[in-house]
């Protein structure tokens, strides 16, 4: 993992600017409002049709490079098209206890940052960064125009393949419902309280830290647990799992072009299109197998028993069970489609479909009420397929499955 620092752009700027000038991709304006500026002429270009004043200033008349100009240099480096590399050193990660570490928060990948000189650099890090097969910039949709400029600049600099490998993962903004904003301590006007959602704004001083959001979610999850199980001792690890699941599903269930108005109560609901609903389904499947084993009955199928399910008579595999199999069978296709379109919401919708299949299976095909061993085995197999599918999809979404809800 690499921190983006000024050093990267400082070293890359002269080379990228020379490439753009040599290719005729930027011109020095001598008159008009952009006199003295280096400008990328975009008027009439296909991606910018219909735009007024589409031309983009890359370097101002006082020699200052604009953000977009820096992003062009950074993009060319990420694509490996600058023909240079930098010196790197491990960057300290400071844990919540204030102790400096050289391990990332996930306990695996070291963090690196660039250096201006070789002294103290890690030679093994050279060549590890930049030159990606694809470069995916995760930036909100309001930056679509600058990102189009960056892509066009890469193309005009003489790297059409690099432009094709440049992807803007655009997403709409994340806002808060008025009730959630006030819950987090944001002071709202009467006008703001009447809105569908409240935008975060640095200019207005409206902002929420991610840590505060998660902390409040954990508190609300504990309240949910105590409401459902009065007298229960609060289980922090379970509340954290529910809170993280609620947040991740809520943030990914919408398509990228939809504004997300985050609401605590809706996110933590145990019914509907929510993380707790999916976690509950996963926990219940595990509970069913555990109860079967407690009764001395077969639980999870082993490989040999699972292989024998396909040989069962069709009478034991009715339409209800086949519907479950078909739903779960679309998992790989859904993964591929989500990766191809960068639409994570497809995974959430699939997980919800599997969750609905579980609830249908639970109510219409109870294992203990099966007529015989063959029918019971078919129902166990369908339930096991649901359990593994939920585990796979929730795992990709980063949604933890607690031991109990």
Show where each model-derived region lies:
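Non-catalytic interaction-recognition regions
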Residues: 1, 6-405
């Amino acid at each position: 993992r690499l921190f983006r620092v000024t050093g990267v752009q400082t070293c890359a700027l002269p080379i990228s600017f020379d490439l753009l000038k040599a290719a005729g991709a930027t011109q020095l304006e001598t008159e008009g409002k952009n006199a003295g500026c280096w400008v990328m002429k975009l008027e009439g270009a296909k991606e910018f049709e219909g735009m007024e004043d589409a031309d983009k200033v890359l370097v101002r008349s006082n020699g200052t490079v604009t953000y977009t100009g820096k992003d062009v240099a950074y993009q060319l480096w990420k694509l490996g098209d600058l023909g240079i590399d930098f010196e790197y050193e491990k960057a300290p990660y400071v844990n919540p206890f204030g102790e400096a570490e050289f391990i990332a928060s996930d306990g695996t990948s070291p963090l690196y940052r660039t250096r201006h000189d070789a002294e103290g650099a890690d030679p093994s890090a050279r060549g590890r960064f930049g030159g990606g097969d694809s470069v995916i910039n995760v930036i909100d949709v309001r930056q679509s125009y600058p990102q189009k400029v960056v892509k066009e600049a890469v193309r005009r600099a003489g790297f059409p393949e690099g432009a094709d490998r440049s992807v803007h993962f655009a997403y709409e903004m994340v806002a808060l419902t008025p009730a959630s904003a006030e819950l987090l301590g944001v002071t709202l006007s009467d006008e703001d309280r009447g809105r569908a959602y409240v935008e975060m704004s640095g200019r207005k001083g409206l902002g929420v830290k991610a840590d505060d959001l998660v902390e409040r979610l954990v508190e609300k999850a504990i309240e949910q647990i105590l409401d459902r199980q009065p007298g229960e001792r609060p289980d922090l690890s379970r509340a954290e799992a529910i809170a993280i699941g609620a947040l991740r599903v809520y943030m990914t269930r919408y398509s990228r072009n939809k504004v997300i108005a985050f609401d605590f109560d809706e996110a933590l609901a145990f019914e509907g299109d929510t993380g707790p609903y999916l976690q509950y389904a996963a926990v219940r499947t595990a509970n069913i197998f555990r109860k079967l084993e407690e009764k001395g009955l077969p639980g999870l199928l082993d490989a040999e028993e699972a292989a024998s399910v396909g040989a069962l008579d069709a009478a034991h595999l009715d339409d209800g069970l086949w519907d479950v199999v078909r739903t779960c069978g679309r998992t790989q296709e859904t993964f591929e489609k989500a990766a191809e379109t960068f639409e994570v919401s497809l995974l959430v919708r699939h997980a919800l479909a599997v969750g609905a299949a579980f609830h249908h299976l639970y109510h219409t095909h109870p294992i203990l009420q099966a007529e015989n061993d063959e029918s019971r085995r078919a129902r166990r197999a369908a339930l096991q397929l649901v359990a593994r599918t939920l585990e796979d999809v929730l795992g990709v979404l980063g949604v933890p499955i607690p031991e109990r809800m």
